[in-house]
């Protein structure tokens, strides 16, 4: 499953770098297009990056606690990770509401919203996945030696984290400078 997700993001990065490294006359032969006011990467995008990195840490903490049989710490780690996922999503919505460009009209907006929107969708799905894990943990379904669903969730969440690091570097930082 994750391999198919990787292929989507590889295709997106291909389109993004093709448009940015070889801008055509249709977009004014510059990247980003002249009428685009980019977001400062060192404000909300950086905050979101730190939130996702912290969420990966809290989920890893919960996973280690599960392996050690520390139920209370697992629950705390999952609750923190859920909260961080929701905060990330809230900041992403705020960023969309205050962006100076739209999805339509140019390749920059289309690639920006497609990539960050698809990633945001994955964060929402991952947060729901973690909520399910929390419910299963509270119901006693996970044991130190039997927790594949938890591990699958952790792999998915870390994949989403890694994708964000590439998006942050490509869209926000590299695109800004």
What does each model-identified segment do?
Residues 1-177:
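...captures the hydrophobic TM-helix bundle architecture rather than a specific catalytic motif
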């Amino acid at each position: 499953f994750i391999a198919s997700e990787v292929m989507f993001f590889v295709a997106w990065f291909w389109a993004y770098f093709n448009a940015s490294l070889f801008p055509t006359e249709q977009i004014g032969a510059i990247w980003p297009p002249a009428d685009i006011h980019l977001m400062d990467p060192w404000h909300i995008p950086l905050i979101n990056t730190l939130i996702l990195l912290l969420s990966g840490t809290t989920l890893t903490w919960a996973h280690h606690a599960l392996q050690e049989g520390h139920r209370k710490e697992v629950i705390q780690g999952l609750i923190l990770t859920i909260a961080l996922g929701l905060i990330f999503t809230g900041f992403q919505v705020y960023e969309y509401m205050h962006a100076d460009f739209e999805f339509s009209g140019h390749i920059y907006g289309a690639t920006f919203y497609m990539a960050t929107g698809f990633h945001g969708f994955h964060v929402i799905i991952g947060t729901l996945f973690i909520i399910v894990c929390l419910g299963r943990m509270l119901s006693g379904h996970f044991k130190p030696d039997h927790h594949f669903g938890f591990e699958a969730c952790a792999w998915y969440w870390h994949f989403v984290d890694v994708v964000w690091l590439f998006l942050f570097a490509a869209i926000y930082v590299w695109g800004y400078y």
